[in-house]
Amino acid sequence: MPELPQVPLTLEGSNVLHQIFRFDWTAWKKLPLDERTAISAEFSALLARWEAGNTEPNGHPNQSALFSQIGHKGDLILIHFRDSLEDLNRVELELAQTSLYPFLQQTSSYLSVVELGLYESSEKIYAQLAEKGLEPGTPEWNAGAGEATARTFASLSSRLFPAIPPAKYLCFYPMDRKRGEQVNWYTEPMADRRTMMHERQIITGSIGLDDWEWGVDLFADDPIIFKKLIYEMRFDKVSAVYASFGQFFLSVRVHAANINQWFDGTLA
């Protein structure tokens, strides 16, 4: 039997964009009340449409959500799930046409795609292809792997193209897998990586798309859950030995119907 590939198959779904903004409160407060009201109404209508997403019964959710950031790293976070990069770019351009946009200063962004790593399935698929006498890397091998992943793709559509959870709080952070001299995630056998990945969350992949390898979005109605979850992750091998974490961004959901409360400083 030929040596099986150590690269697991992956499935990709929604393209995801995080936009982090500072808000120019000084300029905003100088506006007359009627102008602020009009700008707020315009943005609320846009956000409501984005929140609703795709209303077609067989379409992907393709939703957006707004969050009020806690701390000095920014004021607002917009997250968008869309089918393509072009759709994400249209969202950016649509926001830029609003009367609110001059008051927004984008300080950061993060681009990724929902990714499911098929660690366990990959081993089975590779073994089945090898039993058929196929050689890794050949057109026949690639076609067989493609057919197998296509079947899995259909069964995992709701995870690949998720709706944004209705939870009140969001914790977002990027992360890498270490490649140092002492530990290197990518040199571990695929079977070992599969075992360790059973302890991880479903994350978005950003290799070749942004500065980190993955982005993680956690949603909860109790922010202490984030602390407990990340604390527990420090004890699983994937995170404790192989993970390198970026900045953490914690924020509170702002629905379109409540956007006036945010502008007025009365968000509950």
Language-model segments: residues:
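Secondary-structure boundary elements
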Residues: S84-D87, T98-Y101, T195
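Short S/T/G/P-rich N-terminal loop/turn motif that feeds into the first structured element of a domain
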Residues: M1-A52, D83-D87, S112-D192, D221, ...
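A short acidic (Asp/Glu
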Residues: L76, N89-V91, E120
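Short, glycine- and small/hydrophobic-rich beta-strand elements in well-ordered beta-sheets
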Residues: P5, L47-G74, Y101-L116, D192-G215, ...
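Short, well-ordered beta-strand segments in beta-rich or mixed alpha/beta enzyme
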Residues: Q19, Q69-S84, L170-M175, D210-M233
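Short amphipathic alpha-helices in soluble, non-transmembrane regions
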Residues: R90-Q97, K228-R234
